[in-house]
Swiss-Prot record:
Its main location: secreted. Mu-conotoxins block voltage-gated sodium channels (Nav). This synthetic toxin moderately blocks rNav1.1/SCN1A, rNav1.2/SCN2A, rNav1.3/SCN3A, rNav1.4/SCN4A, rNav1.5/SCN5A, and mNav1.6/SCN8A. This block is very slowly reversible. Causes seizures when injected intracranially into mice. This is Mu-conotoxin CnIIIA. It is found in: Secreted. It comes from Conus consors (Singed cone).
């Protein structure tokens, strides 16, 4: 998914908000 292409996508707030993409 697109959010997984973001730097550090699977850490911090981004991961909590988009956990389904990690």
């Amino acid at each position: 998914g697109r959010c997984c292409d973001v730097p550090n996508a699977c850490s911090g707030r981004w991961c909590r908000d988009h956990a389904q993409c990690c």
